[in-house]
Amino acid sequence: MIQKYTYGTPFETDAIVTSIPTSEGTPAYGTISTENGFSFAYDMDDNDVVYGLGESNRGINKRGYVYESNCSDQPNHTEDKISLYGAHNFIVISGKQTFGLFVDYPGKLKFDIGYTLSSQLKITCEDADLYLYVIEGETPYDIVKQFRKIIGRSYIPPKFAFGFGQSRWGYTTADDFRKAADGYRENNIPIDMVYMDIDYMEDYKDFTVNQENFPDFEAYVNEMKEKGIHLVPIIDAGVKVEAGYDVYEEGVEKNYFCKREDGSDFVSAVWPGWTHFPDVLNADARAWFGQKYERLISKGIDGFWNDMNEPAMFCTPEGVAELKEYIKDNFMDKEEAPGFTLGDKVNALANNPEDYKRFYHNVNGQKIRHDKVHNLFGYNMTRAAGEAFEKIAPGKRFLMFSRSSYVGMHRYGGIWMGDNKSWWSHILLNLKMLPSLNMCGFLYTGADLGGFGADTTRDLVLRWLALGVFTPLMRNHSALGTREQEAYQFENIEDFRHVIGVRYRLVPYLYSEYMKAALNDDMMFRPLAFDYTDDAFATQVEDQLLLGNEIMIAPVYTQNAKGRYVYLPEEMMFVKFLPDGTISQEILEKGHHYVEVALNEVPLFIRKGKAIPVADVAQTVKDINPATIRMIGYEGAEYDRYDDDGVSTL
């Protein structure tokens, strides 16, 4: 059962697609106050578990810390960070009472889950203008499925998007991208996509291509497609301020950019220099910006990734002016050396909270200050693209994922987990985010395999790939100036060929499970406790996940480990894809086990009485031969495999 409570005058986020009448009275759970903003307080028992919050730090059980829904350009995913790129305001409390809460509020929202008081859950925001949805069900899984039905069907990508992709910030010329693609093809390592970071553009201007580096971009796109490679360019949120740049001039002429309070176009520095932000919360501006994707689609592009759309800001003219004044007042013509406060002031120029209060959106003729609806920007930038795709190429699927998001964006694209680091702990963070994101409708997701920032290691890339084998988005991505981490850069390339090859062997199963989850408003990845509700130990397990109804995954995430400990809540079949192409299968009883997993092996566990389809390795998804599909798992088990053309919208 779902009940909706309305407080004040909420902003319509379009997160919910089902019409639900407002309930009278107050919710049956917790205590609500609307004095000095909004607060919800609930007393938890010691054994209560709290799930959700989508893209967020720490564990699957969110107890013991504080989290903030405030889409942030935050590349340092350390445990002290309370906000990441997304705002996913859905939680499920499981314990003495089991219920879910979705707070449909687009501004900054704080979840104190046993941080200030260990027994108290407290949700607060500065404005008492929101919708609160209270969902009751017998189990957390039941509650999630109810929520998923009211937020609409998850985005469905083209089937090629289930292949492996290579990316790196620093690929600039046609030869750079060609070299990456050829490095995989020449070493017989499967690949479907090469991603194009910001350097493919002309001066970082959206919807442009550097003509010097790509003199005939359409021919180049076709050349890559002949190799089985889809090029996937990045699009950023900021539009460069430059006379003669038609996107800029059109936006100014039609008043499609976000405004300062005085009505002038708001200015912020990002990669191109000074930029304007398209007012994607305005329906006309959103349609205008979305239509610009056609410029690259007309050249043969069929996939994009949206970035910097929190929106991120390096600085603003106002912030720079304030810094200059601070330096003048405190350091000019003075003998004392500047203290560390000067460095703090410089660093504070980027993503300054005050700057998010300096610009406005035009929503149905009403001027809305950005910070009040901040978490909707990335969502609506991706919505702009998704709505445009339906008009540009009706009936065709496009690959689309974003960095920033809010519940509702899951209908238009997926997300990647942002600028992680080449740290072993981030394999585990990657794993733990998967079910939380699925709870909020984000099925097409994955992390930068091998880590984006910092220098990676061969063993880290292999172990991370062995998790990435199972995530819908499987992409190796790294930062400018870091160690090159393409699979062919390391010794014993055959190990990478094998591990990535396992992904292609599993595509018949992974695609089927993804589509079932999308079409049935279900989760693809779940915590063990969602299925094994009477198993107290399953609630404690946070480094193993159920995938579909057939398998459990338990990656190795510790350097130098030869294997790992696992907990089996029932008898399962331990399966390893071995580097010689064979598959080992061993029945293990319910309980605790240590399993050996070599660096070049991919493990999974098949649940009792189940089986899954596997195919032979292919170099691209379209080359997977259905005639090679066979079943592995328990003898006599059946599997209902979903398949389609992988191109047409549903």
Locations of regions flagged by a protein language model:
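Short acidic-glycine loop/turn motifs at beta-strand connectors
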Residues: V92-Q97, R260-D262, P569-E570, P579
